[in-house]
Amino acid sequence: MDLKQYVSEVQDWPKEGVDFKDITTIMDNGEAYGYATDQIVEFAREKEVDIVVGPEARGFIIGCPVAYSMGIGFAPVRKEGKLPREVIRYEYDLEYGTNVLTMHKDAIKPGQRVLITDDLLATGGTIEATIKLVEELGGIVVGIAFIIELKYLHGIDKLDGYDVLSLISYDE
């Protein structure tokens, strides 16, 4: 299935000059959403994944159906102040400022094989931070899966040494 046909492109959103790739049109088509999920599940099975991790919010949308299909758990990565129990945190730089991601301290057991999921790979900052959290807890990142990769932003460079699946790629 050509998933690219289900992606909506929105010009100048969220700001002028940005060509936004909207995956909600994949999600609202059961066949396309199921196909995308199945492709990631196949990748995860090959990696013998124990748990799926995803950053809010679209990492949840991609990762939860994968975890459910495999009969394994899902661990959320959230912005600071959104998780109720004891957390670890990772602060990283944005173009203008910083961001902090957190994860429950007991979300990953040492040695667990982890698949990280998100909707889109752009600059790679969010996924790089997610990797740091997983590895701090002793998890082993065995795969990272995206619906879309924006190759022209070179986010993949931050994921060197990790096995990455992107279902759709945009070169420009």
From Swiss-Prot:
<comment type="pathway">
    <text>Purine metabolism; AMP biosynthesis via salvage pathway; AMP from adenine: step 1/1.</text>
</comment>
<comment type="function">
    <text>Catalyzes a salvage reaction resulting in the formation of AMP, that is energically less costly than de novo synthesis.</text>
</comment>
<dbReference type="GO" id="GO:0016208">
    <property type="term" value="F:AMP binding"/>
</dbReference>
<keyword id="KW-0328">Glycosyltransferase</keyword>
<keyword id="KW-0963">Cytoplasm</keyword>
<keyword id="KW-0808">Transferase</keyword>
<protein>
    <recommendedName>
        <fullName>Adenine phosphoribosyltransferase</fullName>
        <ecNumber>2.4.2.7</ecNumber>
    </recommendedName>
</protein>
<dbReference type="GO" id="GO:0002055">
    <property type="term" value="F:adenine binding"/>
</dbReference>
<dbReference type="InterPro" id="IPR029057">
    <property type="entry name" value="PRTase-like"/>
</dbReference>
<dbReference type="GO" id="GO:0006166">
    <property type="term" value="P:purine ribonucleoside salvage"/>
</dbReference>
<dbReference type="InterPro" id="IPR000836">
    <property type="entry name" value="PRibTrfase_dom"/>
</dbReference>
<dbReference type="InterPro" id="IPR050054">
    <property type="entry name" value="UPRTase/APRTase"/>
</dbReference>
<dbReference type="GO" id="GO:0003999">
    <property type="term" value="F:adenine phosphoribosyltransferase activity"/>
</dbReference>
<dbReference type="GO" id="GO:0006168">
    <property type="term" value="P:adenine salvage"/>
</dbReference>
<comment type="similarity">
    <text>Belongs to the purine/pyrimidine phosphoribosyltransferase family.</text>
</comment>
<keyword id="KW-0660">Purine salvage</keyword>
<dbReference type="InterPro" id="IPR005764">
    <property type="entry name" value="Ade_phspho_trans"/>
</dbReference>
<comment type="subunit">
    <text>Homodimer.</text>
</comment>
<dbReference type="GO" id="GO:0005737">
    <property type="term" value="C:cytoplasm"/>
</dbReference>
<dbReference type="Pfam" id="PF00156">
    <property type="entry name" value="Pribosyltran"/>
</dbReference>
<dbReference type="GO" id="GO:0044209">
    <property type="term" value="P:AMP salvage"/>
</dbReference>
